[in-house]
Amino acid sequence: KAGLKSGDRILMLDQDTLYQKNLSSSDIVSKLKGSSAAPIRLSVYRKKADSIFTFDLTRGPVPLPSVSSSYMINDETGYVKINRFSQTTFIEFTQALESLVKQEMEHLILDLRGNPGGYLLPAKQIADDFLSDQRPIVIVESNNGIRERTVASSTGLFENGSLFVLVDENSASASEVIAGAIQDNDRGLLIGRRTFGKGLVQQQMPLGGGDQIRLTTARYYTPTGRSIQRPYDSTSRDDYYAEVQERYNTGEMQDENQIPLNDSLVFTTPKGRKVYGGGGISPDLYISNEDSPEEIWNNYFLRSSLLNNFIFLEMDLKPQKYNFDNPAEFFNEPLPYKEDFIDAFKTYCLENSFPIEINDKNQEIFLNSAKAFIAIQLFGENLHTRIVNQKDPFIQKALDTIDAL
């Protein structure tokens, strides 16, 4: 709002010099934080203009949206990404869904990958938007055996269009409530890999002195009666928390036939489909992690900060190459000077003792990833997600399924 731009280097906060003090990012953040509505003055250096600018700002709450992206993939298909379930998630989701419905959306891809959960209420409210009146959403059973059954109302925003929910091994808790409600009601298809398997309701209790303890007070069950929670009574604490990693060792991450199915915990949906309890929710359409873009070329590299750091330096030193004002223009244009970009990045990796090979097999994925990182700097996370999704096998599976309808 005040005119700060991505890439500006903060030199001073009020009268406090911040540069050349070997401060960490957390040190800088702690200095920037303070009382709400308090005025501060920042002096920044902007390389593109080769000038120092001063901004008078007012501190305020930092928004942390839980709906990180929403847009129309094509004329008929919408996409919404939810990162976590917070107090504002349902409001954010409703705004996104209403916008997509106004654009005549017929199919929706709801992305819950990597979503660890959070508040239960917004998850129930979101599921309600997809289900017709009185359809079951979730069952919560307390420690004393009392069961509370939540059912849908008659006011859902998207009760009839086709629905695809993307999940993976890091989709947990409230994410699994939505996934279970959709699958058990035959409302849509789950695409991805088996979810985490956390179906416990926990209440946080203060102990004094800033300490807290979380007490388990209830369990979640899907509408058919499946327990979401992975069993933990016959395994060690370490083994329980290592279970997701163990899926790599058993082959489950590459082969859906390795997903453990408990024949004694078989449930049936209204349309006669068999679904299994025992921990986590298995997808209807499986995606191997080998099909994920990061697995195509050096998973460790993508998780490192090399590409992000290189792009920051590249955009800082050569701003004229990335002079885009319109996100649509940037989205539709190929990465500028791609051969020079690749050569410069290879050199940068060598200088950082991390030689990398970019070849015909991985070049397309690399350039798409690089373009997505640049999009964050220029336009924010929504455009970043749109670019990443162009090469996403989960998204492609959903689109292929829609085409086959």
At which residue positions do the language-model features occur?
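Conserved functional hotspot residues or short segments at active or partner-binding sites
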Residues: S227-I228, Y232-L405
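Residue-level recognition of conserved beta-strand edge/terminus positions
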Residues: L13-D14, Y45, P231, G278
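Short, flexible surface segments
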Residues: S6-G7, G209, T224, K271, ...
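Short, well-ordered loop/turn sites that connect or cap secondary structure elements
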Residues: L4-K5, S25, T269
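Cleft-lining beta-strand/loop regions that shape enzyme active-site pockets
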Residues: D14-T17, K21, S25-G210, R219
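Polar, glycine-rich mid-to-C-terminal structural blocks
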Residues: A174, D186, R193, G197-L265
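A short glycine-leucine-enriched loop at secondary-structure breakpoints
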Residues: K1-R9, K33-S35, A181
